Amino acid sequence: MSATKLTRREQRARAQHFIDTLEGTAFPNSKRIYITGTHPGVRVPMREIQLSPTLIGGSKEQPQYEENEAIPVYDTSGPYGDPQIAINVQQGLAKLRQPWIDARGDTEELTVRSSDYTKARLADDGLDELRFSGVLTPKRAKAGRRVTQLHYARQGIITPEMEFIAIRENMGRERIRSEVLRHQHPGMSFGAHLPENITAEFVRDEVAAGRAIIPANINHPESEPMIIGRNFLVKVNANIGNSAVTSSIEEEVEKLVWSTRWGADTVMDLSTGRYIHETREWILRNSPVPIGTVPIYQALEKVNGIAEDLTWEAFRDTLLEQAEQGVDYFTIHAGVLLRYVPMTAKRLTGIVSRGGSIMAKWCLSHHQENFLYQHFREICEICAAYDVSLSLGDGLRPGSIQDANDEAQFAELHTLGELTKIAWEYDVQVMIEGPGHVPMQMIRRNMTEELEHCHEAPFYTLGPLTTDIAPGYDHFTSGIGAAMIGWFGCAMLCYVTPKEHLGLPNKEDVKQGLITYKIAAHAADLAKGHPGAQIRDNAMSKARFEFRWEDQFNLALDPFTARAYHDETLPQESGKVAHFCSMCGPKFCSMKISQEVRDYAATQTIEMGMADMSENFRARGGEIYLRKEEA
């Protein structure tokens, strides 16, 4: 923890300095590479970790080395991970997908914004200082057209986005030749289909079947295509967002960039404070990853925080506002039905979802059915016009392990399955949100229920937390559950930070949450047997056994922390080549002893072989040349 707490002014100044001086930055001894596709402009970024050679023999004067292959890894940092790209947050990122969107010819630019709220914000001169300068002219589908990746997939069309994803998901593993690195234990996939090589056609087929989604609003052309589905790599979402009492636009942009650096596949902007609209514009124009929101939060702000005053009209206006800004997926709590609310009465912790509690309060105060459920088809029509994916929210998720897997939770899940089928009628992409707080022995049922009742739509869970006793460490308690449910088939894990249940996360909390969840996602990929998932582990183990300390640091998810921990006790440069660490010291290092045993065994084998040959030579009479019949 930091010894001195910064003031609000200092925090904003630091964040402003961060974005003013932002440059593309590579991780230590890594370089950005690109793999091109067949579609024009498909140029898929990856990070390649360069490794040092292995000493295999020779003398001190003339050592002999064997090269180690560079390790390609999935990279979510976009232009921020390429030192060759000039970064200007004021101008935003390059519009990677714009030519692909335009080439399809099924969209049109809007001359007037559809949202009354957006019109009012644009007309307010007092917001000029906060406004992103290069506001995008939004597009929507032409009349009678649908512009979703699901629509294209069902038509048999392989889009550039799909080819981009196929290359990205393969992670350049075809470049790896070493059998040691390619070795992988068989996994247990629980019914997931994990092909050795992911093709663009496989991506198209998974999207067409509804088993995967590509969150890619036509008004967020800056985003790099990615996919969420159980037959692909497990993904991680990071939540950011300001509140009424803390954080600023500068800090949220800083958190966005920071999140993508540490591996966030998507980012949700959960802002509830002032300037939600302006904050979101800055985030979208500078985000290389899909952005999700919970529109009910902003709709509530528009009615001064009074849930009973919410209306369909205010909510619809918010959907249009956010869709035209470029939000890639909406969390919609349409499954919180009036008849389900009494089911939560006997719970220990009631309704803990913000969106769920808002809708429950509205339903009870009006004694009417949830207006999101009533107007769900209209929501789908809006999403189909911009390609906004739906993340059907679990407003009745359990907030304690005592409430796990109860009647209310699964009643809502079944309704989400019904809504999924309706969304698919409109070619709208759907994923399903899940819990929450669930003890380990009850986790798998959540996955099997979701697959059965939600028709294999991708599952997206918050953890789940496996115990409730560790405030301040809930990234651990939830990381355990996340690894398990990812193994069982969950497609995306929403990170939990150390501040969960305690406060709004800062930059360091975001990093801690992401590292924890990248570990969980990777562990799930290994357990499922995802092809190529073990390459980085094998490279790390090989570097560890060969005492290549620099390579160990650089292969780590967090190279900086790995190096810092090592250097706390062995800070000298000699410690980076030593055949031991400070835990065991030079006399008791198990790997050093293993190497000595291996060398000794090899020497003994040679000596025994020589002795056998000598004995054989004497047994044959000591003749240098053997007769033909003896040879």
Curated annotation (Swiss-Prot):
* One Gene Ontology cellular component annotation held by this UniProt entry: cytosol
Q: Which reaction does it catalyse?
A: 5-amino-1-(5-phospho-beta-D-ribosyl)imidazole + S-adenosyl-L-methionine = 4-amino-2-methyl-5-(phosphooxymethyl)pyrimidine + CO + 5'-deoxyadenosine + formate + L-methionine + 3 H(+)
Q: Kindly tell me the pathway this chain contributes to.
A: Cofactor biosynthesis; thiamine diphosphate biosynthesis
Q: Where does [4Fe-4S] cluster bind?
A: C581, C584, C589
Which note does the record give on the cofactor?
Binds 1 [4Fe-4S] cluster per subunit. The cluster is coordinated with 3 cysteines and an exchangeable S-adenosyl-L-methionine.
Quote the record's binding site residues for substrate: N239, M268, Y297, H333, S353, R354, G355, D394, G395, L396, R397, E433, Y460
What positions does the entry give for Zn(2+) binding?
A: H437, H501
The UniProt record lists the keyword S-adenosyl-L-methionine: yes
Q: What is its EC number?
A: 4.1.99.17
Name residues in a coiled coil.
none
Give UniProt keywords alphabetically: 4Fe-4S, Iron, Iron-sulfur, Lyase, Metal-binding, S-adenosyl-L-methionine, Thiamine biosynthesis, Zinc
Give the GO molecular function terms: 4 iron, 4 sulfur cluster binding; carbon-carbon lyase activity; zinc ion binding
Query: Quick check: keyword Chaperone in the entry?
Result: no
Tell me one GO biological process term: thiamine diphosphate biosynthetic process
- One matching Pfam family is ThiC_Rad_SAM
How it assembles, according to the record, is: Homodimer.
> What family does this belong to?
Belongs to the ThiC family.
Q: What does this protein do?
A: Catalyzes the synthesis of the hydroxymethylpyrimidine phosphate (HMP-P) moiety of thiamine from aminoimidazole ribotide (AIR) in a radical S-adenosyl-L-methionine (SAM)-dependent reaction.
What name is this protein filed under? Phosphomethylpyrimidine synthase
Upper classification of the organism: Bacteria, Pseudomonadati, Pseudomonadota, Gammaproteobacteria, Enterobacterales
Q: Give the encoding gene's name.
A: thiC
